[in-house]
Amino acid sequence: MNIEDYREFCLSLGDDVEEKLPFTAFHYASGVLVFYVHGHMFSFFDCDHYSVITLKCQPERIDELRAAHDCIVKPFNMSPKHWLGIDTNTAPDDLLQELTRNSYQIVKTKYKAKRS
């Protein structure tokens, strides 16, 4: 999935999705685009080097996903216990979409409950 299609997919997940470039003050992270729900990130990638998307995931699923899919890699700059990376060059679109929806739901559910 190319960068534009992935961006549109993330924004289509709900009216509560926001996108930001929050790290513009940092030279090496100025191109990192982050997608948020309820003010918390669920997906991000570097626009200048669109090769890995970092997503939230249930800890109990991560090892299974890594074993089943070569495209599952270490997350960029996040805890590998709760986050995974997905190689955009080799990941099938359906897997990327499923894992992105999952990440969105994890964060939305967790922080919606805290807002109530």
Task: Walk through the language-model features, giving the residues of each.
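Charge-dense, helix-prone N-terminal extensions
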Residues: M1-S116
